[in-house]
Amino acid sequence: MDEANHSVVSEFVFLGLSDSRKIQLLLFLFFSVFYVSSLMGNLLIVLTVTSDPRLQSPMYFLLANLSIINLVFCSSTAPKMIYDLFRKHKTISFGGCVVQIFFIHAVGGTEMVLLIAMAFDRYVAICKPLHYLTIMNPQRCILFLVISWIIGIIHSVIQLAFVVDLLFCGPNELDSFFCDLPRFIKLACIETYTLGFMVTANSGFISLASFLILIISYIFILVTVQKKSSGGIFKAFSMLSAHVIVVVLVFGPLIFFYIFPFPTSHLDKFLAIFDAVITPVLNPVIYTFRNKEMMVAMRRRCSQFVNYSKIF
């Protein structure tokens, strides 16, 4: 009888970020600039690494794949978010929501594991430089990449297993600009406290475990270098600085989200914007800004593109 009195929800409504037209315009400009910058920056890294024979090394192979992950991650939320800014009814189908959740968690999990692989690459380069190319051979690099994607996809499938069979009978409003899984689950017609806890625990585990492994790895590298040479620690820290900054950018919002005792809608939205729009732009900037070899290669690639354009 109860089921007959409820209609099954087939689409969800995003409440968005603001109803003010002026703020919407500012957000449109802000998100558009950052999204286009993210696309151009990460694509430039991928094209530069794949086309320049001087950059055919394990470090740049992993960096190019991180850029691909950034492209997929920001494209899973940013285009719809920009498209919805001026729409009165910001809707998404149940299937669209499931697809968005899958990509967000699959790519996010893959990125975390790939950062661990990049930390291992730095460990070998700094602590075992003579054996670097032997240890970080092409087969091992591909293995790292495959394992990263497998773990990311498994993590995402586990998350989806909690929600694909849920019944949604109303309300259907999400106080967000994308399919935020914890908020999505709360709209189900059943008691969702336990389910929400399991989903949060799954994401929290992979995030915290990856973060701890990375921090321990960086500390181990610095301690190892310190034992060999007191002066070498500054060079090691210089080589690791970009990686540490990226780790803070990736994991900072996640850790703050999980440990902050009084989460709010505004805080969650800010962290989501930072993670989805700003971080994918900063990653290529941070990794290339202090890398002279990469900067020279990117300038060379841009010059070739400009010269090619002039011909036509």
UniProtKB/Swiss-Prot annotation:
Output the InterPro entries linked to this UniProt entry. Answer: GPCR_Rhodpsn (IPR000276), GPCR_Rhodpsn_7TM (IPR017452), Olfact_rcpt (IPR000725), Olfactory_Receptors (IPR050427)
Family designation? Belongs to the G-protein coupled receptor 1 family.
Q: By its UniProt entry, which Pfam families does this protein fall under?
A: 7tm_4 (PF13853)
Which SUPFAM superfamilies does the record associate with it?
Family A G protein-coupled receptor-like
Which parts pass through the membrane?
26-49, 58-79, 101-120, 140-158, 196-219, 236-258, 270-289
The protein in question is named: Olfactory receptor 4F6
Q: Where does this protein reside within or beyond the cell? A: Cell membrane
* Species: Homo sapiens (Human)
